[in-house]
Amino acid sequence: MGHELTTEQASEQFILEGFEPWKMRRTATGSRSKLFVAMKPPWAMAERIFTDAADHAAGRTRRKAYPTELLHITLVGIGGFQAIPHGLINRLQTAMEDVQARPISVTLDRSALFGNRNSLALHNGGGLPAISSLAAMIRRALRRRNLPCAPQQSLTPHVTTIYGCGKIDLMPIRNPYCWLAGDFELVFSHYGETRHESFGRWALLPDADDYPQTAAQLDLYAPEAA
């Protein structure tokens, strides 16, 4: 995802009574494709992020910047799968129609090292509570329809720019990355192919209710200070 599922999260998949058990291996997370709900930056912004990350990676790590078309902020992880779970996806698509939420102003003004593999990511130093609220709304929509998602965790919205780079210098942010997020989508990330397949995109509506002002914004991965 951006926040990609951790090994523990992705290996835990709910098998719901009355539903066909979706074919999923309970082995290492890295051997499975991932299904998640995310928002992606506009193409021009994603290109700018990629270019800056690629420049930063040069001479610092052998890892390459994450491709433009794959940059995202994960909202909710669904699980890891051996094959595309079409039946589940149909149910998820129906649930996503229930989500009525406003567009979100996104600003990424800091970099940090996230996750056990020390991947480089962009985030907001003051938090992005509206994104946390949107993620909570999506989870509620899934629960109402008895659909699975990864165990609920606190959320630090972020865009991972270089995966598995180790403890490299943080990327300086001279001009914050800002955009208005107008939709979210259901994404299947194909393992080993560096490819996302979208299974639907849902608009955020300007006339929807405001997000709560007290959404908790807790660090999930305890990023280092930029």
Where are these regions (language model features)?
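Histidine-dependent nucleotide/RNA phosphoesterase domain, centered on the 2H-phosphoesterase fold
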Residues: 1-226
